[in-house]
Amino acid sequence: MLRRKPSNASEKEPTQKKKLSLQRSSSFKDFAKSKPSSPVVSEKEFNLDDNIPEDESSVPTPEDAEKSGKKLGKKWRAVISRTMNRKTGKKMVKALSEEMGDTLEEGSASPTSPDCSLDSPGPEKMALAFSEQEERELPALSRQASTGSELCSPSPGSGNLGEESTAPQYTGPFCGRARVHTDFTPSPYDRDSLKLQKGDVIQIVEKPPVGTWLGLLNGRMGSFKFIYVDVLPEEAVGPARPSRRQSKGKRPKPKTLHELLERIGLEEHTSTLLLNGYQTLEDFKELRETHLNELNIMDPQHRAKLLTAAELLLDYDTGSEEAEEGTESGQEPAVSTVADPKVDIPRDSGCFEGSESGRDEAELAGTEEQLHGLSLSGAP
């Protein structure tokens, strides 16, 4: 029977075992090597506000961290950046303090300021002042950024005041007036619109068909919408009536014969006329040349005055009667048209007759003045 030969695994040389172990270790990344221990987390909670030593030996630098291969946390990175900022800040402060010290030494060497060294601040005070200045500059910049828009945005009042001061005030012409019935406050960015208050009266300059009119309010020219205003009717200025004004300035019609004779300066003939039947003005209107012959009034000036006064009285009375008839005839067609609208009756306003009566009054007053002038010229 065949027998199996015993294996010679145990008889292998130690050198071969060492080779195998080296191969395994190299292929499996050296598991036998001890693993790096994880950093121990302290039970006390880390706080950035705590005082951290600023010595180079106590604080790990970025180079040491890269050599060790340890991963730093966010807290450590913050600590490192803080320390680096402090170091750079100190260097800048030292450089500034040295420059300031040099300038102060130059100032102390001058004879004009012998006591400058006593009042000059030291480098430590300068460093504190510099740090405080940096802290103040940050909020100042933020304030400037926040208020930048306010400064840049133009206020509505400033632009309007500038325009009002430079632009001359509009004086006319105007095409009407309008009263505001609804308050309206325009946008602060709209410089052309007018601020309207109820009861304001606007002088209208232009009425375009678009609906936004142009007007003058409180000395300021601007636009406004017609829906906020009511157009005021234009004041109808009637034509002047010179006849009434002239009649007011002149004397009224005499009421008695004696008053008429006093005006023309012939009071001496009053008794003669009264005794011969001329008691009133109605009787005096019928005076003729034949009557003067019967009354034995032969003075040509007196005869002319008396005849002219009688004619003017007659014309004045006939004119007034015709004016009254004209007014009555103007009223009668209106009544008839109401009763029977089909009847066609010519209308008469009586304006023409009224003008003749006023003209007669003026002529009567003019003749009286002429008679008075003749009497004065004929007097010795």
Swiss-Prot record:
Disulfide bonds: none annotated. Residues 173-234 form the SH3 domain. Residues 143-158 have a biased composition (Polar residues). Keywords: Phosphoprotein, SH3 domain. SMART domains: SAM, SH3. The keyword Phosphoprotein applies. Residues 252-316 form the SAM domain. The keyword Repressor does not apply. GO terms for cellular component: cytoplasm; nucleus. It comes from the Eukaryota. Belongs to the SASH family. PANTHER family: SAM AND SH3 DOMAIN-CONTAINING PROTEIN 3, SAM-DOMAIN, SH3 AND NUCLEAR LOCALIZATION SIGNALS PROTEIN RELATED. This is SAM and SH3 domain-containing protein 3. It comes from Bos taurus.
